[in-house]
Amino acid sequence: MTARKSLDRYRRIVIKIGSALLVDRKTGLKKAWLDGMCADIAALKAKGVDVLVVSSGAIALGRSVLDLPSGALKLEESQAAAAVGQISLARAWSESLSHDDIVAGQILLTLGDTEERRRYLNARATINQLLKIGAVPIINENDTVATSEIRYGDNDRLAARVATMTGADLLILLSDIDGLYTAPPHLDPDAKFLETIADITPEIEAMAGGAASELSRGGMRTKIDAGKIATGAGCAMIIASGKTDRPLNAIANGARSSWFAPSGTPVTARKTWIAGQLQPAGELHVDEGAVTALGAGKSLLPAGVRKVTGHFGRGDTIAVIGPSGREIARGLVGYDAEEARQITGRKSAEIEAILGYAGRAAMVHRDDLVMTASVKTKAEKLKKDEAHA
């Protein structure tokens, strides 16, 4: 497992900041806190670290300015609040960063900007150019146009996608939560804090709770989802509290935080994009033999598929689900949904007779597939069993 290191030893860091840290329901923007945050960013940049910020707060700022009532907002109310709040948020970041002669550049992304390959590459090029000229990209979801069906819905996963998109080696999620516990600490007094997470297992996923504040859409569940995206692409992740005046400085000085180790397996840029897709068009449920084959780096053949769900076309991203119900991989499927159902469980040699044309031997070719969960081969399982015998 890769060892944890000091913040200034990382090359590129993405910092996600929750709404509750930036905005007070009664008084609005927390200017003093933001100034401290920007001082931390300036200190990292002075040591040669690229810094990107995924900043929540537009809707929270907008509803404060518009004096909207507490409670859940309708979609159109959220979009109106975002339209007002985005102006205030961008201005606030620009002013605070200017104290250290740093230029801010605002980027508003939609889900399609990271899900569609061409737009993904264009967004990445824009962000990289901002970093090249020494600016700090301030990124948020474009809540003024995003719909409830086509959106990230939280900035934790958006931040993870930005981290993978830009090749960052550390993602920091700052909120009112100081890290991962074995159970929600406000509900379970015996909950234990986890300082280091080597791998996001089903047990780790089960520890996630829900959102605790109406100012924030994300909870521990979305942070774990973000961790799977980031660590799977070789990017470490830290979950820490941002309640202190200088949160990054606090982390550097040993403040409590949970560190998620990056995957030791490097992936290509294309596979990083595939793995980070937030909305797979469908699912291929596979048997244990297919799980073993995929873990050994082989393609997914129709014979190993047991069930097909969803509506998708050839080339769409699908999730591969193992017998336990856990996602183990994602890939670009070689057949549309109807064809995939017809050849499910059949040998590749039978494809032409079933479909009427000689298609690909693989349902998902290994070059178009990336593992999203660790899978042990039979030899590794046997070795582990022998060690415990």
Curated annotation (Swiss-Prot):
GO terms for molecular function: ATP binding; glutamate 5-kinase activity; RNA binding. Keywords: Amino-acid biosynthesis, ATP-binding, Cytoplasm, Kinase, Nucleotide-binding, Proline biosynthesis, Transferase. Its EC number is 2.7.2.11. Pathway: Amino-acid biosynthesis; L-proline biosynthesis; L-glutamate 5-semialdehyde from L-glutamate: step 1/2. It is found in: Cytoplasm. The keyword Membrane does not apply. InterPro entries: AceGlu_kinase-like_sf, Asp/Glu/Uridylate_kinase, G5K_ProB, Glu/AcGlu_kinase, Glu_5kinase, Glu_5kinase/COase_Synthase, Glutamate_5-kinase_CS, PUA. Catalyzes the transfer of a phosphate group to glutamate to form L-glutamate 5-phosphate. Belongs to the glutamate 5-kinase family. PANTHER family: GLUTAMATE 5-KINASE, ISOPENTENYL PHOSPHATE KINASE. This is Glutamate 5-kinase.
